[in-house]
Amino acid sequence: MLKYVVTDIGKMCLYIWPYRVWSWRRLFIFRVLNVVSIAILFETPHRLALVPNVCLYTHMAIPLSTCLFCLCLCICIKYDITQTQANNQRNLSLLFSVFHLVFSTIALSIYCIYQILILVKH
């Protein structure tokens, strides 16, 4: 259990770091590819046994944070927030990171409770 938590905290950091480094287009492609990969995993549940460190909270956090990313991107387009406005871009990048961290924490808690319930049943 601890191994999975440590592994997925590492994954969470990997999902957060591009927010500060990448452009809007690269970041959008990155998020879309994440959602597509999760969708493929959900369509083939028998393969999940072959990927032991794919945790429930990762599956939950990525689509949720991607939806928020798309929402914030639409807000940026509506209010004409461009890349030249560096302060706004940094603030939004930080906001995306916080959203992802919050959803990951909530989903990690749900995952831990789920694992405890499985252990109690056995």
UniProtKB/Swiss-Prot annotation:
Which terms are listed as keywords in the entry? Membrane, Transmembrane, Transmembrane helix
Annotated localization: Membrane
Membrane topology type, per the record? Multi-pass membrane protein
Organism encoding this protein: Saccharomyces cerevisiae (strain ATCC 204508 / S288c) (Baker's yeast)
Q: Which residues form the signal peptide?
A: none
Keyword field contains Transmembrane: yes
Write down what this protein is called: Putative uncharacterized protein YCL065W
**Source taxon at top rank:** Eukaryota
Q: Which GO terms describe its cellular component?
A: membrane
Q: Where are the transmembrane segments?
A: 21-40, 57-77, 94-114
Also noted in the record is:
Partially overlaps HMLALPHA1.
Q: Does the keyword Membrane apply?
A: yes
